[in-house]
């Protein structure tokens, strides 16, 4: 009985978190969501940095951190 209750609570929490995420990030549900944003940031010139939006800077920082991470390098050896 307790395992069924835990399973139901887990299912409800997944559904609620999915709904809240979709409401907080509606662009992820749209067809024009850019999944190749990191590829676009790969070929930046110095002049391009002046045109970046804050979200682009966050992606660029995440990409740089991922490249510096030793665990990331181990995955590709």
From Swiss-Prot:
Residues 1-24 form the signal peptide. Keywords: Secreted, Signal. Transmembrane segments: none annotated. Its main location: secreted. Expressed by the venom gland. It comes from the Eukaryota. It is found in: Secreted. GO terms for cellular component: extracellular region. Disulfide bonds: none annotated. The keyword Secreted applies. Belongs to the non-disulfide-bridged peptide (NDBP) superfamily. Long chain multifunctional peptide (group 2) family. This is Anionic peptide 17.1.
């Amino acid at each position: 009985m307790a395992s069924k209750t835990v399973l139901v609570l887990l299912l409800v929490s997944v559904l609620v978190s999915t709904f809240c995420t979709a409401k907080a990030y509606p662009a992820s549900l749209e067809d024009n969501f850019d999944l190749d944003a990191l590829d676009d940031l790969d070929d930046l010139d110095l002049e391009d940095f002046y045109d970046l939006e804050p979200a682009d800077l966050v992606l660029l920082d995440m990409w740089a951190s991922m490249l510096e991470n030793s665990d990331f390098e181990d995955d590709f050896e």
